[in-house]
């Protein structure tokens, strides 16, 4: 991904997947004024990454990559974004109104999705959907 001329920075993380645990996911910051599209970047990845399983299953453009104070990509923030997106998609697909309110770094459980239940969905219903994933939820 980083070899594409329009890519300024790329962060690749494992996003949750109910079937295999995690799948590759890329967040890309483009160089200023680039008009490159997600589809172009996916095609570039497919053409240049030798291992098919390593090609990102989700690619998202970001205005600015989250960084540490020394300028390195802050991957925990990217993981939180991926967990939020994947869990919300799963809840929506199951026709549940609950959504991820935030993802916290729990001292014992690690990254944990905090679910806003809105008083509508039974936690057992939510569990049937989210317990399939590797990251915890509350």
Summary of predicted features, one role per range:
Residues 22:
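Glycine/proline-rich active-site loop of Rossmann-fold NAD(P)-dependent oxidoreductases
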Residues 1-10:
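Short acidic amphipathic segments
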Residues 9-17, 25-32, 38-138:
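Conserved C-terminal "lid"/linker of ANL adenylate-forming enzymes
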